Amino acid sequence: MDALVILIPLLPLIAAALIGIGHLWGTLDGEAGERTTAAIASWAISVSCLVALVLLGGDLLEWTAGSFAAGQWLGSANLSVPINFVTSGFSMVLATLFAVLLFIIIRFSINYLHREAGFHRFFFLLSLYASAMLLLVLSGNAVGTFIGWEIAGLCSYLLIAYAYDRPVAAYNAMRVFITVRAGDVCFILGIGLSYAWAKTVDWSELNALSAQLSTGQASAIALCFAIAAFAKSAQLPFAPWLARAAEGPTPSSSGFYGAVMVHSGVYLVLLLQPVFERAPLVMALVAVVGLLTAIYGFVSGLTQTDVKSSLFFATSGQLGLMFLECGLGLWQLASWHLCAHAVVRGYQVLSAPSLMHHILGNPIKPVDREIAGMRWLYTASLQRFWIDQITDWFLVKPVRRLSHDLAYFDDHVVDRAMGIPLPSLRTISTLAQMEKRKIATRQSLYSTLGVVSSLALEKRKITPQQENQDNDFARGSGFTGDLTRRVTAVLYWFEDRLVIRGIGEDMIDYGRRLGLAANKIEQLLLNPGYLTLFVLTILLVAL
């Protein structure tokens, strides 16, 4: 029965692969393919949800073993990273809850994104994200959890930039991606320290061996995972990224920043409860950061003018309270708080568009007079306590400068030295670019048919610039590209002059004569006398 746990993250992954391949091949494209795409995504998450419910029932009835090992992924003399999953406890409860919420979000998205240009791209990313989140909570080791952690972050980045033609969406996606990566570095460091001191990356073994770790070792491991949790769950000083994530579509906002992904950090702290209990200073830090974030979310949310930003600041504040509960040792309360908040906040984000439609024009409840009279607090709330600018100065801008320098070095040194072919820079790299190119082609065709007559279409000629652009498509750069181009030119000359142009009447006549001569030689060899002479000649040569 425990083996069924593999299907929970696997089915959404298969759905994402089918949607992606179908969209790339053109079988799932436009409004005609929406029903198939929606059916693939819905059925995959539905079956995953049912399997999760079955395993949760088996856990409550004590029919499961609590874990399942599907094999070994990495292994050496000192390191073993198995492919194992958890089928009991809070991980199973959270996986079931997330599966149910993701099923609701996918069903909601089918009508919400109907006739959207990025319909298939959205469901591809949402299915991949569902697989990543289910892997994150069900994996029995740090490596598997980190894989789900990273894939979920990548899907978050791509869905924030869903409207990639809008500069604000693309910029906010980049900001969120860079900010969360700072926490991912600490996650990797925590895995390394766990292996260095506990000789394991398995969660259950790490928790069991936490009593043998010194206070300093346990504190270092707990601190690394705590910083990763702060970044993923939008705690100070990483909190501002959550408001920037509002650029994505409403269903993805609900799945990522309302109901599911933002709780990953709290889950990580709950998962490592024994390790954190061995590190009292880190638990105190978790409590302080949670309290400050709760205050920050409450005050900043008072001055927001749109419903999604208000909900996201409220989410950040509630997550801060969960970290405060973990820091105070109220682990059970934090678990219940997480589950309840995921349900409530997911519903609020999904119903936000409908709410705005029904309460349009109604005044909102004013803040208390005491708070309203604090001008400095009002200014700080409008500026979001200047944390966004501080994060820009110390994190985002240095990373952008470094990436700009690396890109310049790659373009002007590496590419010219290696001769990277230009098609690698010009081909379609994302589903979004492919959709954009298809839409542009359709619009160009429609405008041409509407303005230009059929006679003008027949007389249309390709300009020299277009011809040169087409010819330059497969042209390489650098020494290697130049050498390849010259060799290709020689081979083309040989093919054109000696093969293509050489096939004329003379070549056909020569071929016919050669065939007749070969037939005569064959008839002579088949003559018994000549055949005997030929055999004797070969024997004499051999002797």
Write out the residue ranges for each language-model feature.
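...captures the hydrophobic TM-helix bundle architecture rather than a specific catalytic motif
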Residues: M1-D415, G419, L425-G450, S454-G481, ...
